[in-house]
Amino acid sequence: AFSQSVADSTLLGLPGDNLDLYAVLDLFQKSKTIEDFEKSLNLEKTGINNMDLDLDKKVDFIKVVTKQEKDDFTFVLQIAVSEKETQDVAVILVSKDEKKKITMQIVGDKDLYGKDYIVELKETSTPAVTANPGYKGPDTVKVVSAPATTTTVIVEQAPIVQYVYSPAYAPYYPPYYYGYYPPYYAAFSV
């Protein structure tokens, strides 16, 4: 599981400590559909979502809103914090350039992760070192100070990418809102 521990002294001290964007992007790549991604993201057993923005001591449901402009997709991860207010948590950007090369990245909301918190895929066969000190994965985490570099990675083989660019793709519009959630979702304690 990828959940974070509140007791960890290396946390950023921001609400984003409770949702590791590296784990979210990894889950997104492995998902077959947007609905599958949304469901997996919100299941307690995956251990990824531990956000409690409405401060009710229960993990909030993260809804995935799809926006498309030609060959570019934006998947907005949102939490309904009240009946009248939603909070964007992060956005996943998937785009195809004129040479048909597909890129993917996730950008954390500045209020939750700080300014310019961007996770991009890294071309490597081993897990990338995470810059999020709240990350609790199976491997030991090292925080390394290094100049930021941008690496474009071809991600055509990811199941979710094959799905959104297939002729069978239909945009997903989740019907959920504050107080109304899917039957598989059970708000668990943080």
What do the predicted segments below correspond to?
Residues 4-190:
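N-terminal low-complexity segments enriched in Gly/Pro/Tyr/Ser
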